[in-house]
Amino acid sequence: MYEYCSVVIKKYSKYTIPSFAPNGFCSMLEPPQIDKWQHLSTNCTLQFRVLLMDSGQVLIHVVLNNSTLLENIRLPLGDNQDLIQFSCKCPIISCKYISEEFGPRMLRRFQINLPNDIEFNRAIVSLKNLNFVLRTAKTSIAQNTITSQVLDINNGKKVNFAEGTNTSNYAHSNTQFQTQNMITDFSQRCQEKSEREPSNRSNITLPQDNFPIGQQSWPNTELNVVHSSQDLNTPSATQTVLSRPEPLNVQPSEVSQSLAKTTSCLPNIGNQKNQTETISDLLSRKDIAPCKPGLMEVVHLPKERVEKESRMHSTTGLVKTPTTTVWSLEKENTIRQNSNNKENADNKLSDSQKSRGINTPNRRTEIPLNGTLNGTKEEVSLGGEITVSVKNANRNASRKISKRLIKEKLKDKEFMNWVNKVETVLNKMFEK
């Protein structure tokens, strides 16, 4: 007997459940299960040996502590690819062979993990020289079977073996061993490579009782995450939610005051109506002239009426806004006695004004925002009858509208339509 090759083994793995294979390697076999493997690697000495016999046979042994045979395979030298096959991927060599030790043909598996590339290459060259079938293991198999990295446990762990000496053709010794370092790990094909290149491969460890597990920390890579939504605490993300304004109750006496406080103006229709209108026309008009501070149309009245106006200004309820005051061209006593005479007079004045507006160019009525007249004024002659100059620029006094006038205006459909439009405009402004 001649020892052809002998290498040291770092780890030995054995599949505990043989597969029934009546047709040899061509039989339909279930894939091996990871939890059916047993491993031995610590507190012992393991060797893989290839021996040549004088009878032309080959012996393959896996020896524990130079005395116990864990694998004892006897094969004819030469064409034996139907009896044994090897798969290799540095630093692991896997073997499967057909055994008839217990009668039916069974397929058994084992695998060895060599300590370095030198021992791995020595074993591969020896097997190739003896015409054994060696196949390169697929990478996908290694990735599916390697689930953990196992380190040697401390001294003091006991390993019990039942040594057996029964040998037969194509069979191994009936050796059983128990150890506390048996875990659910089949292949360590990438174990050594992971140790040499820790940065290229990360080892995944499974928790197991009574075993020191090799733990490898993952690198804490800081990722710059760009958030698609802004933080609600940042000033750019916080939005001021305006509360809904209270409903505005617009009364006929407050319409002109509300218009003066807003900066929104409706388009002018001066092409159809003259901008200088009488008192009744100003109340019933449906549009407001564009706003421009500093200019306003002034109606000139006699001095007697100016004095009456100044007295009435002190008792009105309108404040600090330039508004158009409603005045009749007839005497107040006549208006109080007969409202029909007032309407007739208003109609005459409106007709005369329309006739004058045909030949006069359109003029813009401009309302100052600050509530004062800046000295610029336009003079309007109403039918050539009355011309009054109002020189008081500041109208800060309050004004009063009589109940009778309010009742009359509430009955006026055109005036009420205009009030409704003003209310609609104001509501839209507050909604914005």
Curated annotation (Swiss-Prot):
The keyword Nucleotide-binding does not apply. One of its GO terms (cellular component) is chromosome. Keywords: Chromosome, Meiosis. Its main location: nucleus. It comes from the Eukaryota. It is found in: Chromosome. InterPro entries: Meiotic_Rec114. The keyword Cell inner membrane does not apply. GO terms for biological process: reciprocal meiotic recombination. Belongs to the REC114 family. This is Meiotic recombination protein REC114. It comes from Saccharomyces paradoxus (Yeast). The gene is REC114.
